[in-house]
Curated annotation (Swiss-Prot):
GO terms for molecular function: L-lactate dehydrogenase activity; L-malate dehydrogenase (NAD+) activity. Catalyzes the reversible oxidation of malate to oxaloacetate. Signal peptide: none annotated. The active site is at 180 (proton acceptor). It holds the Pfam family Ldh_1_N. Belongs to the LDH/MDH superfamily. MDH type 3 family. This is Malate dehydrogenase. CDD domains: LDH-like_MDH (cd01339). It is an enzyme of class 1 (oxidoreductase). It comes from the Bacteria. NAD(+) binds at residues 12-17, 36, 100, 123-125. The gene is mdh. Keywords: NAD, Oxidoreductase, Phosphoprotein, Tricarboxylic acid cycle. The lineage of its organism: Bacteria, Bacillati, Bacillota, Bacilli, Bacillales. HAMAP family: Malate_dehydrog_3.
Length: 312
């Protein structure tokens, strides 16, 4: 019997989920199953068919299935969760947390039933708390439940730095710690352009402005769109994580991981530098932090814990 292709299921066929499915197929990383609720089964099938019809033009071989039936996800190597509601005007953060937690728990039960050996990558906001909810519901080891925010936040930081210096984004590296949101901690000391520390290339006031813009990166796009939120960069970030796992690349990526004493915190999911490979979370990298960075990280932890208090 010939070797079968890897299988990736994406739960939630909105803009981010559908774009993640397309990028994953386009890179020939795996066959893809795109899942949404029964009421949206036809649009989900339509998106999958549309992607499939792009394959002869783009020149990729991958099977893409749209469905509302979790049986179709059986035996997935990776399951990406983008399902959930966005915060609407007048909705409290607690309402958002409660609603999305219920969605996470029901989705996770289906994932565990049909793909008990998979690795789960969570994107749904508030992502630190939602990843924790999935971890608890799944009963999986922490290595197999991770969240995405740091790859995206770092990508935004790198984009703004490259614009500032008029350089290729490929030559800019960076790292963002902490929760996803206003309390994220971009580690400027560990950020470089062509191996040269950013602090030697960009004046402090400009660097501070870039850090602040990174923190507000999601909001900037929401304001410009007027309706909806970012999806190209979030989907590209998810795809980078999927590729690192399927190809066992052992990439150093900022990932939302479960802490057990690292950075002085435990029992919480938080964005930290990690090594991502075939087992999912291969290792958490502990960096030496300054007192200021530690204080910033603690503030970030408190924000995440405040959201987690709402979890059942």
């Amino acid at each position: 019997m010939g070797k079968t292709r890897s299988k990736v299921s994406v739960i939630g066929a909105g803009f981010t989920g559908a774009t993640t499915a397309f990028l994953t197929a386009q890179k020939e990383l795996a066959d893809v199953v795109l899942v949404d609720i029964p009421q949206l089964e036809n649009p989900t099938k339509g998106k999958a068919l549309d992607m499939l019809e792009a394959s002869p033009v783009q020149g990729f071989d991958a099977k893409i299935t749209g469905t509302s039936n979790y049986e179709d996800t059986a035996g997935s190597d990776i399951v990406v969760i983008t399902a959930g509601i966005a915060r609407k005007p007048g909705m409290s953060r607690d309402d958002l947390v409660s609603t999305n937690e219920k969605i996470m728990r029901s989705v996770t039960r289906e994932i565990v039933k049909y793909s008990p050996d998979c690795i789960i990558v969570v994107l749904t906001n508030p992502v630190d708390a939602m990843t924790y909810a999935v971890y608890k519901e799944s009963g999986f080891p922490k290595e197999r439940v991770i969240g995405q925010s740091g790859v995206l936040d770092t990508a935004r930081f790198r984009t703004f730095v490259a614009e500032e210096l008029n350089l290729s984004v490929k030559d800019v590296t960076g790292f963002v710690l902490g929760g996803h949101g206003d309390d994220m901690v971009p580690l400027v000391r560990y950020s470089y352009a062509g191996g040269i520390p950013l602090e030697t290339l960009i004046p402090k006031d400009r660097l501070d402005a870039i850090v602040e813009r990174t923190r507000k990166g999601g909001g900037e796009i929401v304001n410009l769109l007027g309706n909806g939120s970012a999806y190209y960069a979030p989907a590209a970030s998810l795809t980078e994580m999927v590729e690192a796992i399927l190809k066992d690349q052992r990439r150093v990526l900022p990932t939302i991981a479960y802490l057990e004493g690292e950075y002085g915190h435990e029992g919480i999911y938080l964005g930290v530098p990690t090594i991502i490979g075939g087992n999912g979370l291969e290792q958490i990298i502990e960096l030496e932090l300054t007192d200021y960075e530690k204080a910033q990280l603690s503030k970030s932890v408190e924000s995440v814990k405040n959201v987690m208090k709402v979890l059942s």
